[in-house]
């Protein structure tokens, strides 16, 4: 939902946006969207052939191969922003090869323990590796783990913590976002339902606040984007790169 909201707001702002997510629900093409539309078969086949020819004897996993192909395709799309969803964890994920301009960790939960570790501290360490030195690193988890905070500080990332740097408040009709220097009030609740949607939405608005000099968005675009009910997804861009785990 974080990427879905971010994509919708940026599209409502008139930006040309690409989105890479996984897994797909029905068709593989769902993994790559440009301006809100899934790419065509021909678009994918051309990029698959490009990666197959370039890899030589290098062995690639399914996810590595498809990630490289889709990123290669996005390079030709004259994008303003590209949203990339991390597949698993962060530190060793293929998506992490992108040097993101902004990164979002929405939560640190016990998941995929056989690969990421069986504690929140271990998983937080893996996820924190999508952060970059000197760039916004958004953490929307209300109880951030020490390993994530320590790594962000050790590399000199611009760490934004929920409850310290940004927050939200709300009543039955509307909610409000408060950041370091931006406040957004009278917001309708996100079309995407769920217990964590305001946490996710506040993380999105924190990322947009952090990137506002490169990707300015209006209050109208935010309201319009939050009202759109899109498939759950995630984020990163190379003209305004944002990563999400």
Regions inferred by a protein language model and the residue ranges of each:
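Aromatic/hydrophobic pocket-lining residues that form π-stacking "cages" and hydrophobic walls in ligand
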Residues: 6, 70, 148-152
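Acidic, Mg2+-coordinating active-site environments of NTP-dependent enzymes
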Residues: 58, 78-85, 100-188, 201-223, ...
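A conserved segment at the C-terminal end of the G1
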Residues: 2-16
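Active-site catalytic microenvironments for nucleophilic, acid-base chemistry
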Residues: 9-13, 73, 207-214
């Amino acid at each position: 939902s974080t990427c879905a909201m971010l994509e919708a707001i940026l599209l409502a702002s008139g930006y040309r946006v690409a989105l890479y997510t996984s897994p797909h629900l029905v068709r593989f093409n769902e993994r790559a969207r440009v301006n809100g539309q899934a790419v065509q078969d021909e678009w994918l086949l051309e990029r698959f052939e490009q990666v197959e020819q370039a890899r030589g004897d290098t062995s690639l996993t399914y996810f590595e191969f498809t990630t490289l192909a889709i990123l290669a395709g996005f390079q030709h799309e004259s994008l303003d922003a590209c949203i990339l969803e991390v597949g698993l964890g962060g530190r060793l994920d293929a998506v992490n090869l992108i040097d993101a301009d902004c990164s979002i960790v929405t939560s640190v939960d016990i998941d995929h323990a056989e690969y990421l570790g069986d504690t929140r501290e271990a998983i937080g360490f893996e996820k924190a590796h999508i952060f970059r030195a000197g760039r916004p690193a958004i953490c929307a988890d209300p109880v951030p783990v020490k390993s994530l905070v320590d790594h962000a500080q050790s590399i000199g990332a611009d760490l934004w913590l929920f409850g310290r740097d940004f927050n939200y408040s709300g009543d039955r009709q509307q909610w409000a976002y408060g950041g370091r220097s931006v406040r957004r009030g009278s917001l309708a609740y996100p079309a995407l339902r769920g217990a964590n949607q305001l946490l996710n939405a506040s993380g999105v608005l924190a990322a947009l606040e952090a990137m506002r000099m490169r990707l300015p968005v209006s209050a109208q675009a935010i309201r319009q984007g939050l009202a759109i009910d899109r498939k759950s997804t995630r984020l990163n861009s190379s003209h305004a790169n944002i990563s999400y785990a």
